[in-house]
Amino acid sequence: MSKNNKLNGKDNRQSKIEKLSELKLRHDQLTNELYHLHEYISLVEYDPFYIPNSENYERLLEEKDVTWGSIFQEKKQLHNESSGKKVRRSVRHLRDSGSSTINELDTMSENDINLLKEVDILAKQKLQDLKLQFSNSHIKKKGNTKRAKIVKQVPNHQDKSESPQISERDVKTVVKDLKPNHRGSEIKPEIMESSDVKNEIENCDFNEKQLKLYKDDDIASESDFYFTTSSEDELPNKRRGTIKRRKRINLYVNPPKAVITNPDNIANSHYPTLHEYLDSFKILEDDMTNEEYNTFIKEQQRFAKMIKKGIETGALKYDPVTETVQPSARKVPNMFSHAKVDPIQYMYKEQNLHIHQEHLINQGLFSSKLVQNRKKQRIAGAKKIAQMIEQHFKHIAGAEDRRLKENEKQRKAIARNIIQSVKKRWNLAEKAYRILKKDEEEQLKRIQGKEHLSKMLEKSSKLLGAQLKQHPNEDDIENSTSDDFSSTGDSDNLSSSSDEESDDEINDLSEDQKNNINELKTSSTSAFSSPEISSPSKNPDLGLNSLLTNDFENESNSSDTNEEFIMGDSDTSHSDDENLTDDSEDSNDGEHDTTSDNEKSDLFPADTTNDPLAVQDVPTPSLLRGTLRTYQKQGLNWLASLYNNNTNGILADEMGLGKTIQTISLLSYLACEKHNWGPHLIVVPTSVLLNWEMEFKRFAPGFKVLTYYGNPQQRKEKRKGWNKPDAFHVCIVSYQLIVQDQHSFKRKKWQYMVLDEAHNIKNFRSTRWQALLNFNTQRRILLTGTPLQNNIAELWSLLYFLMPQTVIDGQKVSGFADLDAFQQWFGRPVDKLIETGGTYEQDNETKRTVEKLHQVLRPYLLRRLKADVEKQIPGKYEHIVYCKLSKRQRFLYDDFMSRAQTKATLASGNFMSIVNCLMQLRKVCNHPDLFEVRPIKTSFLFGESVIARYSERANSITRRIHFHDKDTLVDLQNINLQFTNNDLEKTSYHTNTINKLACINEFVEEVQKLRKQNAEEERQKSRHLKINTQNISNFYEEFMQQKLDEQENKINFIGYLNSQRCSRKTVYGMNLIRLLEMPHVSNNCIDDPNYDDLIKPLQTRLLDGRTTIEKFAVLTPGAVTSNIGELTLGMDEFVTPNSKSGIIPYEELVQLDNPFHQVQTKLTIAFPDKSLLQYDCGKLQKLAILLQQLKDGGHRALIFTQMTKVLDILEQFLNYHGYLYMRLDGATKIEDRQILTERFNSDPKITVFILSSRSGGLGINLTGADTVIFYDSDWNPAMDKQCQDRCHRIGQTRDVHIYRFVSEHTIESNILKKANQKRQLDDVIIQKGEFTTDYFSKLSVKDLFGSDVVGDLPVIDTKPLLGSDSEAIKDPKKLEKLLAQAEDEDDVKAANSALREVNVDDEDFDESSTNKTGGNILNGDDIDEDVDEYEGTNHVEEYMLRFIANGFYF
């Protein structure tokens, strides 16, 4: 019994599990359907075999409380209420068999958990079986498929009555995929025959042609992962029992019916079935209606009938090969083309239509692709996760190795730091040892230096004495020193082409030079009666002694020591000014007699031996054209003394004192007196190369000058034949080209080498300095305006360049070859003097050092300032001309300042915005046309419209039709208004008779009386009644009464007309007029002169009135018409030509000149009057008066302006007044610039030269003008200073007046007023020739625009435009860029071009040195501060020093 009970219990448990699994399956299908309807609304893509496993699915079941766990828990809870057990639902459904788990809860027993697991497994197994059965029933049959063969035999002892069982371990059946393999290869299963299993399979419902047996490896190789989808083709890899016939499950879905609340939404079906509805469509095209479709069908039927008829008649025949209809050979009307019909390439819409089944197939294929892609993505994601996990474990496994490597790396780093520290310590010890050794060596050098300095001072004294001595025989000195000087320290490395020549050739050359000098002397004597020199100075004892002594006293006594010895930055202009005046100019000032011997004795006393420092006077060379000033003559004497004493020197006169002419006079002196014609080499900056050539042609035309420039090919042509004797006397070359062609210049021997702007070769380490030092030259002269720089090494480089070795009394002594000693003697005391500015009390050592420096420099340096010779230079006077604004300028100025945008800009304090406002106001001040151009007014031209001609013709026809309407509509004769016709038709007798016979008046009166009586009676009856339309009798009576009233009015009017006609009277009568008529005599000729003015032709009238039209035709109409000729002259093209009337056709009238052209142009276009150009601007009004005064006084003026557009206005102004002028702006080429300046200086008829301040200042010398007019001031004051220097130069013989135009009550006057409060105008604009931002950085908006303009603005306007932290204040170039943004594009280009020209020489001298200036001595400050870290280790340091000193370290 116990066994039976157990068996029954097991059966009951198995049956319960079976029922629960079926319930579980139905539950999953229903919940799946519920979820699909909830998510996708419809069941089109519903898959009953797919159980979703997502958070949304679980959330939905929990919200609806329909989870399987909750149902089971509720049932269990009801069953266990008595026992108090509580079950908590916690079941989760997963899709995969391995992932379907039930959370174990503490409140649930193990039996319940096992039961749920078994139910879940069995339910999923049933679902897989159902899915397999459903998929096999839908496989299409294939005719060529073979029967599936069994892989493994079934045991014979199995009962055949039972259903055969196929183990999933042995066989896996796979449904053949509808889609072929991508590679085109089919899977070939491995087949094993088994008859028993074959019979069992035949008993099943499955079609054997629909199955294939594959090996396990084939399926396993396809995918290592399995993902449950609704469209997978693989069979489940589950173990199943015996294959048996299973029932088909039919699912009936009853979706809930929609609740319709609006009867309009109820669908009324016109077709009972879908098939009938689809048949109702004739064609599946929306564009074609049913009527069009029927028409198309009829056309096709008719076309088919025609083809059939053609075949029957034999006109056409059917070709079965090409399946086309061809025409027969008989001559019948050609209905078709004989050519082969091309196939239709146009795809009609009907060809692209697909049936519903094809759409479903395509959708299935597309879905399959999506499923496969999703599968691949999941596989790829799983692989990535696996790789990440693998890398993680690898990282964990290698952690120990990495730790060991890190420890090893740290140990190496510690060892490296220790090694570096030890090495650094030894380096410091080595530096300390070297410093100690240096100190010892310097101490020895100081002792030796003092001895060497005393020798140098003694040598300088001897040199100065030898320089000032008067040699009795100069030829002997020249011959004795030429050989000695040629053997300099660098002459060993030189080779001269002149060495190849024989001594005979040299002697011949000297004889030729003597002959040439004699010829030039005779020619110069004929051209000039006698050499002229300027008047002597008041001090007769002038000489080098007085100049140098005064300079020394001023330097020693003045507190500002660096003013004399330490000069500032060099001026930007490289061109030396002309220092001579032509003979023609000197003749205007007065005639000078030839200097006699007495005058020479006054200037230079005969007893020169009493003054040891006196300079021997030399005669003015006859080759020099012009007259030297006194200080220039003294410079020539000093240069000649240098030559006579075999000494080189530095001519360091201030810029503008004529270093160029002094150099030319020296070369002329050598040619005339010493018969030394060179060749001489002059090295100048590129910018003044042509200027030097012009100076030689002007003042020394007797020299043959070779200007060395051009491309390499041109320079090679210039070098051809230059080794021949007397090929040239002077060669002028730039610094850049002489370095490039230095090998050619080194091979030639030069007499004199002159370096202009020599302060630019101050870097003795540069290749340029080394190249020039090695040239084969006998003597050298340096020309510079700033010889002494703040760096003593730069001064030494110049002195060493002059005197590498010196010869005194036939002995060679070293010059300034020791830079360290030179710096040791003079560098530190002078640097200390420069740093303090001379404010500290000088000690005796410093004074002695300065005196020694003076003593060393005195023989080699000559410097004069303009302050010393200012009495010999014409004066410069500056005038401020205040100009009132014109009415138009004042209106534009005030309008701009009153704008809200301008006030907002000023209140913002933005620098660029304020500068833009300043630029606009400056334009208004210069000329209002720069701010707002006066417009050219024109009339609005109305063109002829399309309907104009037709409307004009219609109006003409209408006027002609209604021309006589006034005669027909109103008869004026009847109302007696045409009384003049009475005299022409009737006499007075007729009119009187008609008036008497007018008897109708009585009849009319009687009729009126009767009507009046009847009318009064009727009116009294119906006075208070209206027309009654209700009663027909009353209505008729009232209507007739109205009719009688109208008739009465008509009779009254006729009576009125009759009375008017009968009352006509004549004034004179026809008989009187006939008596007074006189016979008419025709005469076609009229001799009255008054009639001649009336019959003048149109052209004559216009010619006579041309003057009147020119003066008074000033009003321009607002609009004019384009066909004015047709309207005024009758030039209408619609006038039909008539030979009798003589009307000219329109085509001929068009060819005629328009006689009204002048009037039309004058009245249509109004140009501004030319005089308004002057009267619109206050500055031009002042300029007109000033130019007239200057022209009357014989002066010539230069007008400068910053803006290029102002030059255009000035051109119009000068043309209007008829002045001869020339123009030079930034667009003028450099080669044209020299031509313009020479023409202006040579032609006194040219009164004005207008220039742009941005036109560049190199090579421009306008000494022909004595007046400078600044129309406006430039942003950059250095530009204005440069403009002044173009006129106020040494070559100027007259005083220079500078006029600066300033507009009153504007920003210009405010800036000038503020500047005058701080300093004088010259100091504000010019600060040593550099651009200054002082007046910009210190001016505020209130200072610029005035207190009345910015009175209501914030406090920010009282602050400076640029703050103290602004970069523009620190860097002037940045300020220039900011100001350039507010200027016009042409002005900015001109300014940049001018700056490039000024800085072109910087490129020649821009050469970075290999090493920095200064010695390599290491001071104690160079030691690193890390020494403090080793405090307390002095014994180690002492040991290291002893170790190094004993020689063990090296």
From Swiss-Prot:
GO biological process, one term: chromatin remodeling
CDD domains, per database record: DEXQc_SRCAP, SF2_C_SNF
Gene Ontology MF annotations: ATP binding; ATP hydrolysis activity; DNA binding; helicase activity; histone binding; structural molecule activity
Residue spans of biased composition, Basic and acidic residues class: 589-602
Catalyzed reaction equations: ATP + H2O = ADP + phosphate + H(+)
Domain HSA: 344-417
Domain of life per record: Eukaryota
Cellular localization per UniProt: Nucleus
Region entry Disordered, spans: 469-618, 1400-1424
Record keyword Transcription regulation present: yes
GO cellular component terms listed in the entry, alphabetical order: cytosol; Swr1 complex
Composition bias, Low complexity: 480-497, 523-540, 549-560
PANTHER family xref list: HELICASE SRCAP (PTHR45685:SF1), HELICASE SRCAP-RELATED (PTHR45685)
Family per similarity comment: Belongs to the SNF2/RAD54 helicase family. SWR1 subfamily.
Protein's recorded name: Helicase SWR1
Gene responsible for this protein: SWR1
